[in-house]
């Protein structure tokens, strides 16, 4: 603990997982669960979420892309939040499919809060006139990706988007995933 800056410096043993280390490649997000006593680190470069013991900071497990995960999203966890029973809510870098929700065991549950793509009236008009071949050549309209995620005390999931053209920048999702 640094009494001047009021920060707690944590030393994490690096190295391979087989040797008991935590091979961080480029961590971007962190979340601590007091309820579960675990520290979660989102590392898009390693394409994993590392779960550490909250007291010893020893690696407990790592979670890669779940085998049952649907969609095209490359599993590059960028931001992370964890609820009281251990469900993980992960913002995946460059994902347009929503927030990835994992079960406490690391299995894929669903995409939460799919953001809707913005198409202006002119684009909509031209798409309606285009042939199938022309539509293939047009740029796809992707939903804005989320930039952060957190939970409130009632279990609602909050997310933000950095899309400057979007009217909605902060989202609050209920258990069904509705804003």
Model-derived features with residue positions:
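Eukaryotic scaffold repeat domains enriched in small/polar residues
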Residues: 1-179
